[in-house]
């Protein structure tokens, strides 16, 4: 699956002030995804395993 990475509060994980390539590494390391990029202003991940939670508009608390 794919989607936005979340922080510890369930909000989209911001990449606004992160260096280039940060989201790819973050998605691979923290979400076990195949890749990711900064879809300004948040990290978007591809190839996320089905058991890993990603941000969902329906359950958004931010």
Swiss-Prot record:
InterPro entries: LCN-type_CS_alpha_beta_dom (IPR044062), Scorpion_toxin-like (IPR003614), Scorpion_toxin-like_sf (IPR036574), Scorpion_toxinL (IPR018218), Scorpion_toxinL/defensin (IPR002061). Residues 1-62 form the LCN-type CS-alpha/beta domain. Keywords: Disulfide bond, Ion channel impairing toxin, Neurotoxin, Secreted, Toxin, Voltage-gated sodium channel impairing toxin. One of its GO terms (biological process) is defense response. It is found in: Secreted. Expressed by the venom gland. SMART domains: Knot1 (SM00505). It comes from the Eukaryota. SUPFAM superfamilies: Scorpion toxin-like (SSF57095). Disulfide bonds join 11-62, 15-38, 23-43, 27-45. The keyword ATP-binding does not apply. The keyword Translocase does not apply. GO terms for cellular component: extracellular region. GO terms for molecular function: sodium channel inhibitor activity; toxin activity. Has the structural arrangement of an alpha-helix connected to antiparallel beta-sheets by disulfide bonds (CS-alpha/beta). Beta toxins bind voltage-independently at site-4 of sodium channels (Nav) and shift the voltage of activation toward more negative potentials thereby affecting sodium channel activation and promoting spontaneous and repetitive firing. This toxin is active against both mammals and insects. Belongs to the long (4 C-C) scorpion toxin superfamily. Sodium channel inhibitor family. Beta subfamily. This is Toxin Tb2-II. It comes from Tityus bahiensis (Brazilian scorpion).
